[in-house]
Amino acid sequence: MAWITIIKHSEAKGLLRRQYDAAIKRAAKIWNIVSIMSQNPPVLKDSMKLYQTIMFGESPLSRSQREMVATVVSSANHCIYWIRSHANDLRVEVAKEIKDPVATDEFVRQIAQDWKNAGLKSADYALCEYAEKLTLTPAEMSEADIKHLLDLGFSQTAVHDAVQVISYFNYINRIADALDVDLEHDIVSWEQ
């Protein structure tokens, strides 16, 4: 149960009502992370716009890479809400490539629980390593970390976009945990 009051859709007015309606149009529901931000509609609006841009906008990073990074960051932060949410989104993206539901679930489980043993290609391994380091020890980041990604074939735009995804999920993980966002009941858990 959330630790602050959530303004319900039926009670929402103005900008909040428009944001809720947009969420329903996009996802056929209002996610709990959206409703937890109901106390400040302008922040909700800007946060959701940033999310849509970094996760669905043009990028040299694939959708599956962005979802993988989101899952790794959420796992490093032990943020159950976002681990479940983005492991589920990662499953959707990876299923397009792997085509075997059992192998897909196992891959997603590995990314969420122990990404270092998920059998990643060297570039994706380095991307996850970068995400975990920036999440857990941001003061230790150096130019060498970026050079390593560039040497593996990532463009500067890809590195920039990775930093955006990593930073956003550190921000939104903290909102979910600090305000006790309820888990979504309709997300199939990779833990089953």
Which ranges hold each PLM region?
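Hydrophobic alpha-helical segments
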Residues: 1-192
